[in-house]
């Protein structure tokens, strides 16, 4: 009996060691993730598009992100004309990817709901920083815009962590099939985005078209309104009104 118990104890310890090996643990986590994640093939056709990654709007957003450093570099170098042209094209692509996502079946995705505002914020933040460096936008307004965006990004990551269920990993964190959530812009946020883009476009075109003093005064007034909407929409996001768990 004693010998049998010893062999059983040794066998149990060996089995436990096998289960706790790194490779086996990763395999167990992977199988658990597969059980907790919905299979795209098992979803209705109208639901499958939400989990797509390779969509036309996502490709357009990626191109806009890739072009952002070039536009910022042109502003820093005071090459305002090509910077204005590229910024106008980037703004047009923002409208284009939104139109495609809303009107073309299978092109609206959860990744796009996050990637599109990230691309917008990256472009706008880059423009505000570089245009402040070039003397086109005042530093206090840029500080408000950048601080709001940093808080939104940090809050978005924290909210994503909150809606996730264990086990926690980077692959599951960025997997749209795991505890999905969607960012829904508020009306004030949409107005703020339009005002920010308009302010950047007018400020950037001022040295290109040599605006008069009166036109520059209008830009200053627009900057004050933009500062207010930036703060107000940031408070709306902080309250969680723009985050929806799916």
UniProtKB/Swiss-Prot annotation:
Gene Ontology BP annotations: cardiolipin biosynthetic process; regulation of cell population proliferation; regulation of mitochondrial membrane potential
EC number: 2.7.8.41
Spans through the membrane: 80-100, 127-147, 191-211, 218-238
Catalytic reaction annotation: a CDP-1,2-diacyl-sn-glycerol + a 1,2-diacyl-sn-glycero-3-phospho-(1'-sn-glycerol) = a cardiolipin + CMP + H(+)
Gene3D superfamilies per the UniProt record, alphabetical: 1.20.120.1760
Subcellular location: Mitochondrion inner membrane
Keyword Lipid biosynthesis: yes
Membrane topology: Multi-pass membrane protein
Enzyme class label: transferase
Transferase recorded as keyword: yes
Keywords tagged on the record: Lipid biosynthesis, Lipid metabolism, Membrane, Mitochondrion, Mitochondrion inner membrane, Phospholipid biosynthesis, Phospholipid metabolism, Transferase, Transmembrane, Transmembrane helix
Covalent S-S links between cysteines: none
GO cellular component: mitochondrial inner membrane; mitochondrion
Molecular function via GO: cardiolipin synthase (CMP-forming)
Pfam family name, one: CDP-OH_P_transf
Role, per record: Catalyzes the synthesis of cardiolipin (CL) (diphosphatidylglycerol) by specifically transferring a phosphatidyl group from CDP-diacylglycerol to phosphatidylglycerol (PG). CL is a key phospholipid in mitochondrial membranes and plays important roles in maintaining the functional integrity and dynamics of mitochondria under both optimal and stress conditions. Required for proper mitochondrial membrane organization in germ cells, but appears dispensable for the functioning of muscle cells.
Family: Belongs to the CDP-alcohol phosphatidyltransferase class-I family.
Protein name per Swiss-Prot or TrEMBL: Cardiolipin synthase (CMP-forming)
């Amino acid at each position: 009996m004693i010998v049998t118990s010893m062999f059983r104890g040794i066998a149990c310890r060996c089995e436990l060691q096998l289960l706790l090996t790194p490779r086996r643990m990763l395999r167990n986590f992977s199988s658990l993730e597969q059980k907790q994640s919905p299979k795209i093939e098992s979803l209705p056709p109208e639901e499958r598009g939400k989990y797509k990654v390779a969509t036309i709007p996502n490709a357009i957003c990626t191109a806009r992100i890739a072009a952002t450093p070039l536009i910022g570099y042109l502003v820093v170098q005071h090459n305002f004309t090509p910077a204005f042209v590229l910024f106008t094209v980037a703004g047009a692509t923002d409208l284009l990817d939104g139109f495609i996502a809303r009107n073309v079946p299978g092109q609206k995705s959860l990744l796009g709901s996050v990637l599109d505002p990230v691309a917008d914020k990256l472009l706008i933040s880059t423009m505000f920083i570089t245009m402040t460096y070039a003397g086109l936008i005042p530093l206090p307004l840029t500080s408000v815009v950048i601080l709001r965006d940093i808080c939104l990004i940090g809050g978005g990551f924290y909210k994503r962590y909150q809606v996730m269920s264990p086990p926690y990993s980077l692959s599951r964190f960025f997997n749209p099939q795991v505890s999905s959530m969607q960012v829904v812009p508020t009306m004030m946020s949409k107005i703020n985005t339009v005002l920010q883009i308009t302010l950047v476009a007018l400020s950037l075109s001022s040295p290109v078209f040599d605006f008069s003093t009166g036109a520059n005064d209008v830009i200053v007034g627009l900057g004050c309104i933009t500062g207010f909407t930036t703060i107000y929409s940031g408070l709306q996001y902080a309250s969680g009104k723009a985050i929806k768990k799916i």
